[in-house]
A protein has these predicted regions:
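Rossmann-fold dinucleotide-binding core
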Residues: 114-167
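Short, flexible turn/loop "capping" segments at secondary-structure junctions
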Residues: 24-25, 77, 142-146
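Conserved beta-strand segments of alpha/beta enzyme cores
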Residues: 29, 67-69, 133
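A structural alpha-helix within SAM-dependent methyltransferase catalytic domains
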Residues: 21-24, 78, 100-103, 125, ...
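Rossmann-like NAD(P)-binding element
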Residues: 35-38, 42, 53-111, 119
Length: 167
């Protein structure tokens, strides 16, 4: 299995920002998308605030902001992404509709991970194209400091995608 290089993060609340920082610390290229127009400044402020801890924990010299880009549409953020992290509000209607859109615009083999803490993955991915790529990846918080992630498959999630996600 090839390592994942391109990650999309949808939603830039506390969990989404945590995922962005963690992915950047691991050298991933990260695309961010949020409906809120002020998300860019919020993300950059949190990266700056947390950078001293992140650099120590991951033993890196800096968080490379060249690997971070912000996008205005869902279609743009999903283009060429291999791993998609959804961090939308904890609401079935929102997540089901979002997963349907993600399924339309993402690469057919892209893994889709919802950061949901209590919703069922089979229901979240019920309208998603290729539901075998969908799963729950619920992180411990703060995401960029605590390495634990609860990975939960849906009924149709493939074993291959589970293994790749756990890496």
């Amino acid at each position: 299995m090839n390592p994942i290089k391109n990650v999309a993060v949808i939603g830039t609340g506390v969990i989404g920002i945590g995922w962005i920082i963690r992915c950047l610390a691991h050298g991933k290229k990260v695309k961010a998308y949020d409906l809120k127009t002020k998300s860019r400044s919020k993300v950059l402020k949190e990266i700056k605030r947390s950078s001293q801890y992140v650099k120590k924990m991951f033993r890196i010299k800096k968080i490379d902001l060249k690997n971070l880009s912000f996008h205005k549409t869902l279609k743009d953020v999903l283009f060429n992404s291999e791993f998609i992290i959804e961090c939308a509000p904890e609401n079935y209607k929102i997540k089901i509709n979002l997963m349907e859109e993600i399924g339309k615009y993402s690469k057919p083999r892209a893994i889709i991970s919802s950061s949901s803490s209590g919703l069922l993955p089979t229901k979240i991915y019920s309208k998603c194209l290729n539901p075998e790529r969908g799963l729950i990846g619920h992180p411990f918080n703060p995401v960029y400091l605590l390495p634990g992630v609860e990975v939960v498959p849906g009924k149709k999630t493939s074993k291959k995608n589970m293994l790749k996600t756990k890496k």
